[in-house]
């Protein structure tokens, strides 16, 4: 088809990474900007666009990165595809955090550092989280599933995590 609308959400080096999500009203995109390209504006935001018009409804800056493994390499980039459920959009970060934002206004609802602790895996081996990058999180049977550990910036990990609505 034909282009209905087109919106430039981010400028400079970087941009929408891996995938977006929709909920019938808005399109949600996560922007990741390379740390060595400080001229990009706006840097590392989660943005919601009106699905009918392409108008930016809200943006949320990623903020200062807090990486469990230390300051380098540590990026606030939204480095994974987003996942949308009624009322919330999940975004995985290069800092190892999974965050949930309100779809209405972008308010932070929940933040969990997947790299702050080791996990006992179902096979008995200790798993470690790291960057969250690439594919989206999966929501099924009332749970959120995500991979934590990605070697793009040299921080490996190998955890497949599951969260329930109770936060477990």
Task: Map each language-model feature to its residues.
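Extracytoplasmic/lumenal domain signature
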Residues: 1-17, 21-78, 83-134, 138-168
């Amino acid at each position: 088809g034909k282009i209905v609308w087109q919106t430039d959400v981010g400028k400079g080096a970087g941009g929408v990474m891996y995938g977006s999500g929709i909920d019938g009203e808005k399109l949600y995109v996560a922007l990741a900007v390379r740390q060595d390209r400080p001229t990009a504006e706006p840097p590392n935001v989660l943005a919601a666009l009106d699905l009918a018009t392409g108008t930016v409804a809200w943006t949320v800056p990623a903020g200062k990165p807090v990486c469990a493994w230390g300051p380098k390499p540590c990026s606030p980039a939204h480095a994974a595809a987003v996942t949308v459920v009624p009322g919330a959009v999940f975004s995985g970060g290069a800092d190892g955090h999974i965050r949930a934002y309100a779809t209405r206004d972008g308010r932070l609802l929940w933040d969990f550092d997947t790299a702050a602790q080791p996990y006992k895996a179902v096979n008995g081996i200790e798993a470690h989280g790291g960057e969250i990058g690439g594919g989206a999180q999966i929501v099924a049977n009332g749970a959120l599933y995500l991979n934590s550990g990605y070697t793009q910036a040299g921080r490996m990990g190998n955890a497949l995590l599951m969260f329930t609505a109770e936060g477990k």
